[in-house]
Amino acid sequence: MIGILNRWRQFGRRYFWPHLLLGMVAASLGLPTSLNESQDIVSHPNSASSVSRQNSVSLSLTDLVALKEAHRRSSYSVDYWHQHAIRTVIRHLSFALTTPQTANAQQVDELQPHSLVLLDTLNALLTQDSQFPFVISPHAGRVTFYPQAHHQIGIWLAQIRGIRAGPYLLS
């Protein structure tokens, strides 16, 4: 019986918890924007909306967590458990993506850019504010704002790392 419990504990440590945390991070990347959109539903308790009590309780608990962290980081939009899951995934990835000391230089060069981009993007999720990207159009001379494009990869890269495609000025 003890052997079965030890095997189950080892299975959980090696496979279950890292994959669960990775799933939490992947599923919660869109969570802060959806919480901000649903705050007006929670603020009207007598409305005839289809929000259940469990959803309203979970939203108010995350609002409490956000209020707790508001005095530490006033412009930080990721709640505590999202931050904890991202940090744990960064820790797991940093150990998983490190190459052994006996590896060839060619293998190290192939692995290095991918692992650095992955860790840098997760670190940027922790340290940078979430802002919508602004596109400056050289033809119109005004700033255009795109609030609906939450899940487009180009907009996401422009938001997180300032990466954009094409030349800066058209000549």
Curated annotation (Swiss-Prot):
One of its GO terms (cellular component) is periplasmic space. It is found in: Cytoplasm, Cytosol; Periplasm. Keywords: Cytoplasm, Periplasm, Signal. Residues 1-30 form the signal peptide. It holds the Pfam family SecM. GO terms for molecular function: translation regulator activity. Regulates secA expression by translational coupling of the secM secA operon. Translational pausing at a specific Pro residue 5 residues before the end of the protein may allow disruption of a mRNA repressor helix that normally suppresses secA translation initiation. Belongs to the SecM family. This is Secretion monitor. It comes from Pectobacterium atrosepticum (strain SCRI 1043 / ATCC BAA-672) (Erwinia carotovora subsp. atroseptica).
